[in-house]
Amino acid sequence: MSVAVGDKAPDFSIPGTGGRSYSLSQYAGQTVVLVFYPGDDTPVCTKQLNCYNNELAQFTDVGAQVLAVSAQDMASHERFATKHGFQFPLLSDTDKAVAGLYGTLGPLGFPRRSVFVIDSQGIVRYAHRAIAGLTFRPVEELVGAIRAAG
């Protein structure tokens, strides 16, 4: 399955940092930036999430919630989040079911670096799946997509 711009975003419920479960539906009425990343404490993922964290005010200023998803377990996520002081939740998709729903699994079974902007009605308004995960989408591009989604 693969989600495209204009599709209803599939709901999910998975554990995340802070000892709670997160679902897309709990953010109904709010824009969500759903970030899939290959792994905790890897060079590009660390740079990407630190960039989004450092510029988090740009997301919150346009009413968006960032959720970051990878296949690592909660112990790994808690260490990674604490080490870097992330102000958004890291969600644990250990069985890769959510990555499968969004069509982000790469050939080796890891999530590809991907970002989705989901509007307040739950519709995908922006989708980017990296072929090679050596770069990531800049904050300005994502904020532009959020503004365009209205």
Describe the role of every protein-language-model region.
Residues M1-G150:
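Chalcogenol-based redox active-site neighborhoods
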